[in-house]
Regions:
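Bacterial N-terminal signal peptides
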Residues: 5-17
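A glycine-rich, often tryptophan-bearing local segment used as a flexible ligand/cofactor-contacting loop or short
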Residues: 32, 90-164
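Solvent-exposed loop/turn segments at secondary-structure junctions
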Residues: 35-39, 70-72, 88-93, 113, ...
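Structural recognition of the beta-strand scaffold that forms the well-ordered cores
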Residues: 28-33, 64-66, 81-87, 107, ...
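A short, well-structured beta->alpha microelement
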Residues: 60-73
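Extracellular ligand-binding/catalytic regions of CAZymes and related secreted enzymes
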Residues: 22-27, 33, 51, 58, ...
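Glycine- and acidic-residue-enriched helix-capping/strand-helix junction motifs
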Residues: 36-50
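Catalytic beta-strand/loop cores that center a nucleophilic Ser/Cys/Thr
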Residues: 57, 65, 136, 140, ...
């Protein structure tokens, strides 16, 4: 009888160990978005993050969750390996005095950090800290500019995982230019805008051991319908989470329904 109980305990322990090992391998990614603050189909933070979360979840061992604003419950941050800001001025969200201690702890732990479009921005009080965290800083009130153009999205480093699985293409986008960058930040994507070449995306390997990725596109919701557009962003987010990106790029399958936007409650009936 004792041997039977011992054998059962060993089997149970084996399966519990398997479950624990599986949980440990899950890479949790948190996408921070917000409610609309632009015209319909522009800066659709929540809908665009939902698309990215669906795509991220197609990579084995990865789970992604969207939060409207910084999570109020600290438990939501437990086990998170990478954070993505697709929101108004991500730097001011991350370094808000109410969450700054959390942010600094996460950065010291080497968490992956990504920012998309206006998420690359920060107001002046958070600017320098954001620059040191992301490697780049957008602020149209102080030094940056933006304009809508159709131009070729170019790969500055085709061998980088962010460039896996897609080819250069023409993209109509609201491009940000004249950002501040750390010398160590490395351009990954670029575009020629009004006859001058500018970075469109960059990577930065932080001294704390974490990886950061900035992508300046993302103004127009329609662009998330482009496979190559989604793949570059998803590849970049996975890279910050230290997930191996396959040579053909990350899977980014979506449906036409995924691109549908909810009604705009701001619109008068």
């Amino acid at each position: 009888m004792g041997k039977v109980i011992l054998a059962a305990a060993l089997v149970l322990g084996f399966f519990l160990g398997m479950t624990g090992a599986g949980e440990e391998k899950t890479i949790k990614i948190l996408l921070v978005a917000k409610d609309r603050d632009h015209a319909f189909s522009e800066h659709e933070y929540l809908s665009d993050c939902a698309i990215l979360a669906k795509c991220l979840g197609q990579t084995k061992g990865v789970s992604a969750e969207v939060s409207n604003g910084w999570p109020r419950d600290p438990a939501k941050l437990k086990g998170v390996k990478a954070i993505v800001f697709n929101t108004r001025m991500g730097g001011s969200v991350l370094f808000d005095p109410l969450v700054k201690a959390q942010a600094e702890k996460l950065l010291k732990e080497g968490i992956g950090l990504s920012a998309i479009h206006w998420g690359t921005g920060a107001e002046k009080p958070a600017g320098e800290a954001w620059l040191k965290a992301l490697g780049g800083w957008f602020n149209a009130d102080l030094f940056s500019r933006y304009m809508v153009r159709t131009t070729r999205l170019l790969q500055a480093d085709p061998k980088h995982p962010i460039c896996f699985g897609w080819k250069e293409y023409d993209l109509r986008e609201e491009y940000y230019i004249k950002l501040k960058f750390l010398p160590e930040a490395k351009p990954i994507l670029k575009a020629v805008i009004d006859k001058e070449e500018y970075p469109v995306a960059w990577v930065y390997e932080r001294p704390d051991g974490g990886r950061s990725f900035g992508f300046l596109g993302g103004h127009f919701h329609d662009n998330f319908g482009k496979e190559e557009f989604r793949r570059a962003i998803v590849n970049g987010i996975l890279w910050t989470a230290r997930v191996d990106v396959p040579p053909g790029g990350a899977p980014v399958r979506i449906t036409a329904k995924d691109m549908e936007l909810p009604p705009d409650p701001r619109k008068k009936k």
